């Protein structure tokens, strides 16, 4: 009887440890899931065609040629805007080490590229005004290496006046 109790006690102890480890694992996963809350997104659009004139004027003022709208760059911009809207924050990464370079490459884009992002309750004209008054964003738009661009936005799912903007530039 004592042997049976010891064996039974050991099995119960082993069973309890397994249950404890499983519970701890589930608690950790629940914590991670809470950190990765995904917000609903609203309407989104690639709007490169509507920005051709604005970008041409910006570049002409610096003696540069116009940029052409590009569907691959627009897709990369829309992808980033959607990611930002779902996360509810501005970022150049898409999580877990997926930065701008890997996203651009994943969209079939090679060569030099740059990205401007923004979050706010403003229209396209105000967006470019903000970027032109920021040294880094201005430098990207006036980089003579770039000949193509893609512009997109996605609205925040709970606040339709809040837009997440992305401009991707490339050669």
Each predicted region: which residue ranges?
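N-terminal secretory signal peptides
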Residues: 1-15, 19, 23-34
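Disulfide-stabilized extracellular recognition modules
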Residues: 2, 6-7, 122-171
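Bacterial Sec signal peptide processing site at the extreme N-terminus
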Residues: 32-55
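A generic secondary-structure micro-motif detector
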Residues: 44-45, 70, 90, 127
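Solvent-exposed, polar/charged alpha-helical surfaces in well-ordered, non-transmembrane soluble domains
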Residues: 49, 53-57, 75-82, 102, ...
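Surface-exposed patches in mature extracellular/periplasmic domains of secreted proteins
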Residues: 62-75, 88-96, 114, 138-144, ...
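Short, surface-exposed glycine/acidic/tryptophan-bearing loops
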Residues: 74-122
